[in-house]
Regions:
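A short, exposed helix-loop element centered on a Lys and neighboring polar residues
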Residues: 41-42, 84
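Active-site loop of short-chain dehydrogenase/reductase
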Residues: 1, 48-60, 92-95
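Active-site helix of classical SDR
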Residues: 41, 75-78
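Short, flexible catalytic-loop segment of classical short-chain dehydrogenase/reductase
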Residues: 65, 102-111
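Active-site-adjacent segment of SDR/Rossmann-fold oxidoreductases
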Residues: 66, 85-95
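Conserved NAD(P)H cofactor-binding loop of Rossmann-fold oxidoreductase domains
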Residues: 7-14
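Catalytic Tyr-X3-Lys loop
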Residues: 2, 10, 19-38, 53, ...
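C-terminal helical subdomain
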Residues: 99-100, 111-162
Length: 162
């Protein structure tokens, strides 16, 4: 396996009474959004390092300052930390692990009121697969590459190479 896109996610109920958030919101969110992608990384990264090539993209979230979604947000923040830490172990090699933030898109998870179509996020979401700058542990936000082709997004993300 050369490329892994950890894109599965679980968003728990929106809790207006967030001081009464049940523990299960956290445990379920962490199982799916943090622990599962970490285990997938732990499974595939050693083989990628052994071969000298690989790309892992972990899908994160830009949701911040919303205690109503604390379980979800905390689980994604933990995934960010794991990704950054794992990235430090392969920095400068042709094995790269990064985060991708698709933004708020009209999907089953994002709902019908989201401002962005899934198609508009594609260049920013898959960008990390095509980068070749040997930098790991960064967040690639789809909104930063909106309206670009994939080729334009790669050039914008690595201007010193072009």
């Amino acid at each position: 396996v050369d490329i892994v896109l950890n894109n599965a996610g679980l968003q728990i109920a929106y809790r207006n009474e967030y001081f009464s958030t049940p523990v299960s919101d956290y445990t379920e969110s962490f199982k799916i959004n943090t622990i599962a992608p970490a285990m997938i990384c732990y499974h595939f990264m050693p083989k990628m390092i052994e071969r000298g090539f690989g790309r892992i993209l972990n899908t994160t979230s830009g949701i911040r300052l919303e205690p109503q979604q604390a379980g979800y947000s905390a689980s994604k923040a933990a995934l960010d930390k794991i990704t950054i830490d794992l990235g430090s172990t392969v920095e400068g090699t042709d094995v790269m692990i990064n985060l991708t933030d698709p933004g708020w898109c009209r999907t089953d998870l994002g709902g019908p009121n989201a401002p962005n179509s899934p198609e508009s996020a594609i260049p920013g979401v898959v960008l990390g697969v095509f980068l070749d700058d040997k930098i790991s542990g960064r967040i690639l936000r789809a909104r930063d590459y909106g309206g670009m082709t994939l080729e334009e997004a790669v050039k914008a993300a690595t201007p010193s190479l072009y």
